[in-house]
């Protein structure tokens, strides 16, 4: 068990007279960084994600979901008016829905188990009639004017009459199928298809396409690099496995309406394996063709498939001027509306993000992202760096409103991916095409794990028209590796590689852009206490449960080198910090949310981190002042602030840290470096909350919220504001005057 240093709280018995008590009251805005606290939604389940977000009937319609609830739940259907009033619809049935489709012929939006007409009237299909975790809708193969398909995460398939809502079961949902379960399996596993955890459903070219992104084995709960998931299609009679990888989105240029010309329009599917993102496109004559893209974040990995939510490709332009936005592995992508196997040019990285996004849309000339922010149940995301830290008291999430250009304005588009990773390769065998255009700097790492030398020949498709030309060829000796730096003149939409001899090969690509960020934090962070501040207001944070829907804060102040407790405060959707007399909540936060000690070891060369498997990792050093603060347990180091991944704070740098089942520290991603004394951080109503504030410095900053008595203060914004803290910087290495043995 990790030891806790109680010195931080020993000063709570000191006189509260040491806390400041004067504060000029300022107006608190309705929203911060595009997040409206009043629009947050809660449920009584282990998770409260956003399943779908759709503009319809002059309203924005939103459904939420809890984890694995095929017969309904406390989740709701929300109707949001143009002036941002949230209406909880009485027809709500809950469940785990993420489906949405607009059926033009009947003038209805199908979202979750609901059908909504053009006037906003809602009809529900009860779960006892159509059970399962509704994951997708699709146009009917033979009667698209009168019927639609509903698909569930466990291979249930239903045909629904759009006018009467009569339901015909085609395939039973596996949650309700009696079958003997193996001790090596977890959860309900369908008998028709490999893989579990269904995600996408779409129809076109005479088939219904279904995806899932997980594997139903105990092995999948801890490993990220085993076979998992499926891309499959159904012709109305039989199922066919197209590819055995983890797939999520399946759609086409028709998007939420279905393809306009279903016989010929392409069908797109996104997925991944442990090597890279996979993009599939179906042609009516050629069938499926696959491409690969790099990953910006690895926090979506995991063979169980739980870490992804619902990645999407959606038109966020207009009907006259389509503009497709793709979310995949922590990156916003520009996706061409006319993408096919023979016209594949135009996919481009936009920027990296930290939010977990379940769906998104354009509404009233803004983008609206439905997020999965704070889950009561930590699922598999446990690690000793957090000790036994509790999840939020109640699951909650929110919408994130942004400008239309925000997907171009967040983190740098650094990305990595492989076409081969210690894979057996035959002589003359081509890799799948890998995206080659869209970054300032591109490199490849090539490894030959055979007993003989091998030549690797790279080719490019310059225009995305499936016409390939030689780029360069390199010879790699047995057991050796080579780095390749590509020049800016080496152009192409896609790159592929082949060898002249059989080998065990690795070919991995790393792409980066020039990071134009300053090392100075943006003005939205004014009022966070800098390292040399000796009068900052800190505090421990916890999102309360029992439907209180408030944030609890045990406020502290640093004064004359001592930490003094200033009282217990709460904040609700008005963003006012109010002092409360609630010793039970205060005691819970002090005991359960204390900052653990010895999470990392600061050495002369770098910061040593030992993960839960005993693997040793090193991170760069920052300002020396952080060493003392970390030793005093004055800085939170690790916490989950978006579902199923952690935010890691070390030596003044924030990192995105994947769950251990997604390879953890091996795939850590630096976000930003700052010069602030951030005491604690948490998610609440979709916002990122920080403590460690200098109220006087932040008195003009709307992101700094201070109680009327001046004894409690927080910074509030969005997690993706963190990119603006400053470019990641650091120094150090694995050794510093270290005695090293050979090998």
Region roles according to the model:
Residues 39-75, 94-101, 433-435, 440-442, ...:
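Beta-strand-rich domains and repeat architectures in extracellular enzymes and scaffolds
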Residues 488-505:
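Noncatalytic modules at the cell exterior or secretory-pathway interfaces
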């Amino acid at each position: 068990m990790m030891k806790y240093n109680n010195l931080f709280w020993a000063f709570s018995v000191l006189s509260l007279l040491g806390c400041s008590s004067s504060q000029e009251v300022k107006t608190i805005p309705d929203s911060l960084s595009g997040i409206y606290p009043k629009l947050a939604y809660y449920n009584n389940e282990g998770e409260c994600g956003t399943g779908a977000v759709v503009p319809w009937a002059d309203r924005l319609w939103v459904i939420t979901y809890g984890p694995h609830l095929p017969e309904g739940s406390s989740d709701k259907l929300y109707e949001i008016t143009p002036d941002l009033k949230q209406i909880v619809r009485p027809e709500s049935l809950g469940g785990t829905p993420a489906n949405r489709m607009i059926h033009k012929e009947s003038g209805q939006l199908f979202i979750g188990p609901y059908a909504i007409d053009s006037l906003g009237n809602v009809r529900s299909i009860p779960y006892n009639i159509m059970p399962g975790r509704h994951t997708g809708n699709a146009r009917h193969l033979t009667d698209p004017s009168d019927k639609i398909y509903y698909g569930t995460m466990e291979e249930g398939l239903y045909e629904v009459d759009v006018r009467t809502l009569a339901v015909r079961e085609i395939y039973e949902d596996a949650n309700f199928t009696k079958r003997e379960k193996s001790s090596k399996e977890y959860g309900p596993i369908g008998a028709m298809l490999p893989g579990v955890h269904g995600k996408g459903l779409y129809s076109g070219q005479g088939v219904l396409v279904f995806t899932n992104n997980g594997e139903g084995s105990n092995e999948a709960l801890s490993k990220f690099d085993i076979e998992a998931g499926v891309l499959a299609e159904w012709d109305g009679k039989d199922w066919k496995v197209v590819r055995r990888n983890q797939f999520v989105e399946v759609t086409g240029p028709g998007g939420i309406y279905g393809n306009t010309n279903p016989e010929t329009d392409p069908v797109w599917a996104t997925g991944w394996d442990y090597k890279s993102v996979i993009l599939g496109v179906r042609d009516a004559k050629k069938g499926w063709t696959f491409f690969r893209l790099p990953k910006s974040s690895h926090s979506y990995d995991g063979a169980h498939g739980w870490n992804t939510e619902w990645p999407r490709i959606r038109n966020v332009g207009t009907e006259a001027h389509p503009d497709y936005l793709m979310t995949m592995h922590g990156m916003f992508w520009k996706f061409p509306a006319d993408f096919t196997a023979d016209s594949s040019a135009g996919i481009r990285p936009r920027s990296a993000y930290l939010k977990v996004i379940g769906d998104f849309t354009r509404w009233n000339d803004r983008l609206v992202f439905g997020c999965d922010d704070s889950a009561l149940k930590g699922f598999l995301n446990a690690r000793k760096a957090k000790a036994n830290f509790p999840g939020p008291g109640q699951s909650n999430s929110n919408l994130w409103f942004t400008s239309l250009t925000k997907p171009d304005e967040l983190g740098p588009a650094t990305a990595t991916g492989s076409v081969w990773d210690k894979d057996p390769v035959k002589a003359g065998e081509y890799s799948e095409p890998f995206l080659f255009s869209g970054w300032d700097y591109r490199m490849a790492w090539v490894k030959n794990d055979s007993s003989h030398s091998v030549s690797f020949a790279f080719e490019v498709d310059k225009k995305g028209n499936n016409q390939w030309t030689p780029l360069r060829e390199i010879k790699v000796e047995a057991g050796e590796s080579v780095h390749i730096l590509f020049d800016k003149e080496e152009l192409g939409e896609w790159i592929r590689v082949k060898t002249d001899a059989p080998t065990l090969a690795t070919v991995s690509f790393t792409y980066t852009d020039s990071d134009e960020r300053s090392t100075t934090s943006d003005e939205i962070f004014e009022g966070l206490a800098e390292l040399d501040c000796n009068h900052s207001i800190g505090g421990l944070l916890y999102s309360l449960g029992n439907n209180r829907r408030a944030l609890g804060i045990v406020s502290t102040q640093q004064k004359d080198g001592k930490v003094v407790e200033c009282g217990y405060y709460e904040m609700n959707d008005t963003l006012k910090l109010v002092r409360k007399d609630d010793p039970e909540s205060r005691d819970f936060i002090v005991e359960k949310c204390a900052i653990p000690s010895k999470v990392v070891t600061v050495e002369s060369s770098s910061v040593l981190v030992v993960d839960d498997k005993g693997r040793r990792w090193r991170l760069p050093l920052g300002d020396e002042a952080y060493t003392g603060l970390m030793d005093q347990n004055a800085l939170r180091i690790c916490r989950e602030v978006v579902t199923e991944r952690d935010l890691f704070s070390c030596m003044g740098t924030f990192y995105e840290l994947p769950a251990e089942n997604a390879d953890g520290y091996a795939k850590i991603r630096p976000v930003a470096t700052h010069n602030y004394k951030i005491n604690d951080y948490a998610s609440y109503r979709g916002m990122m909350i920080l403590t460690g504030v200098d109220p006087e410095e932040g008195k003009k900053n709307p992101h700094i919220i201070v109680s009327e008595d001046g004894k409690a203060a927080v910074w509030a914004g969005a997690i993706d504001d963190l990119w603006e803290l400053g470019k990641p910087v650091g120094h150090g290495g694995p050794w510093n005057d270290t005695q090293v043995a050979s090998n």
